[in-house]
């Protein structure tokens, strides 16, 4: 009854109005699993390839009809009549069907859509929530949300070089209360920015994009909003950064255009260490460029014992790159983005490798999202304890938070909010 009888790919729009892939997998028993694929703005050079049509007369070249065609023809033929419950075999067939190291022939967007839709169809067929189907009976940890409330970098049209300034409500007793805390700070920040004469338009991920001159200025506004909302920064709420340093790394220097300043590798490490000393920052993502391996080692040696250092562009959810980082002492955490690697099996393998090495894992969205809330279930399924899925605005972001609220309610007394235990520096 779990045999695949149909696979239907289609072109839909993401949160930026660009085309993306959606897939339905239909089973013999009538179960239908649906998955939509996200897309990034600041993408790592080593990510699996998102296949775009390149026809400038249609969606400015960003159409995904080639990927959809591969789903409806080649992938359907390869998986038709297979049992959907063998996720590992399905994903292996998809990888072999593509035949390239970076999934560039069929496209990681086509492969991921099918991989996730298969898992969702299987869960529906077994009448189980996705987090339970993937994670088993031990899946019960609700993640601490990393809420991106100030946007900069390529996610916003302002002078701030860092891409994201986030709050983490680690002191809340439950996920629902953490969400309330974040919402109250978000709305307080809006009022503070307005009062200071800044615009309160939001960026791709729902955070505000004020015209501020530096990271310090952004952090000061966030700190003020935390206090005025009635919370204690450093106790109830911690701060996190996504520097996205690859985006401003040029000719061996970190070029801060907003500040009209350049920093060497060592100066960049010391600058981040200084921010950690002056603000309650417990997590920094991509503090160094993706290929600045010496910089990553220097930063990890300098502050890795007191701050979570998350590799996104550095690792791109790839076990080979993660293994190299573990061997050489680079970073101490990995950002998990399903579309960076392209299949559910490979995603779960990266999480498992991180855990075994003592690294933390952070489940993450992309800046181009959809209403699909799969990553909320995967965060609980893997018990990773942290999720990064944007601000408290835009339905493509709140869809994930709302799904986590449902999961917490469903788990009831079994639910455990990760809180401070999610971060080794606080545990």
From Swiss-Prot:
Binding site for Mg(2+): 242, 285, 312
BP terms from Gene Ontology: glycolytic process
Catalysed conversion reaction: (2R)-2-phosphoglycerate = phosphoenolpyruvate + H2O
Record PROSITE patterns: ENOLASE (PS00164)
Active-site residues, as the UniProt record annotates them: 205, 337
Pfam families membership: Enolase_C (PF00113), Enolase_N (PF03952)
Organism (species): Bradyrhizobium sp. (strain BTAi1 / ATCC BAA-1182)
Entry's family note: Belongs to the enolase family.
Pathway membership: Carbohydrate degradation; glycolysis; pyruvate from D-glyceraldehyde 3-phosphate: step 4/5
EC number: 4.2.1.11
Annotated keywords: Cytoplasm, Glycolysis, Lyase, Magnesium, Metal-binding, Secreted
Function field: Catalyzes the reversible conversion of 2-phosphoglycerate (2-PG) into phosphoenolpyruvate (PEP). It is essential for the degradation of carbohydrates via glycolysis.
Protein name, entry field: Enolase
Predominant location: cytoplasm
Cofactor note: Binds a second Mg(2+) ion via substrate during catalysis.
């Amino acid at each position: 009854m779990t045999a695949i009888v149909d696979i239907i790919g289609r072109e839909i729009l993401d949160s930026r109005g660009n085309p993306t892939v959606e897939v339905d997998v239909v089973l013999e028993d009538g179960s239908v699993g649906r998955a939509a694929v996200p897309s990034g703005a600041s993408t790592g050079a080593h990510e699996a390839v998102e296949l775009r049509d390149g026809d400038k007369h249609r969606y400015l070249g960003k159409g995904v009809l080639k990927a959809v065609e591969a789903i409806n023809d080649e992938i359907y033929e390869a998986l038709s009549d297979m049992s959907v419950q063998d996720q590992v075999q399905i994903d292996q067939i998809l990888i072999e069907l593509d035949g390239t190291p970076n999934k560039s022939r069929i496209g990681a967007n086509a492969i991921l859509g099918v991989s996730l839709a298969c898992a969702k169809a299987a869960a529906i067929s077994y009448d189980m929530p996705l987090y339970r189907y993937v994670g088993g009976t031990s899946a019960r940890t609700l993640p601490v949300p990393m809420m991106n409330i100030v946007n900069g970098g390529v996610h916003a049209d302002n002078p701030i070089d860092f891409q994201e300034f986030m709050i983490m409500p680690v002191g809340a007793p439950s996920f629902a209360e953490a969400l309330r805390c974040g919402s109250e700070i978000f709305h307080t920040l809006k009022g503070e920015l307005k009062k200071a004469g800044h615009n309160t338009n939001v960026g791709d991920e729902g955070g505000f994009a004020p015209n501020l001159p530096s990271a310090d200025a952004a952090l000061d506004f966030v700190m003020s909003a935390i206090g005025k909302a009635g919370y204690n920064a450093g106790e109830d709420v911690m701060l996190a950064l996504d520097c996205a340093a690859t985006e401003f790394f040029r000719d061996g220097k970190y070029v801060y255009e907003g500040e009209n300043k350049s920093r060497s590798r060592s100066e960049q490490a010391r600058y981040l260490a200084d921010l950690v000393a002056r603000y309650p920052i417990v997590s920094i993502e991509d503090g160094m460029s993706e290929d600045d391996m010496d910089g990553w080692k220097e930063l990890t040696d300098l502050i890795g014992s007191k701050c979570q250092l998350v590799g996104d562009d550095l690792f791109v959810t790839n076990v080979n790159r993660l293994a190299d980082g573990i061997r050489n002492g680079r970073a101490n955490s990995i950002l998990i983005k399903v579309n960076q690697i392209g299949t559910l099996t490979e995603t779960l393998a990266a999480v498992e490798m991180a855990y075994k090495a003592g690294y933390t894992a952070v489940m993450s969205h992309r800046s181009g999202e959809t209403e699909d809330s799969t990553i909320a279930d995967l965060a609980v399924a893997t018990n990773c304890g942290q999720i990064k899925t944007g601000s408290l605005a835009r339905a493509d972001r709140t869809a994930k938070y709302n799904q986590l609220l449902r999961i917490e309610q469903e788990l009831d007394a079994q639910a455990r909010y990760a809180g401070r235990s999610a971060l080794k520096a606080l545990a």
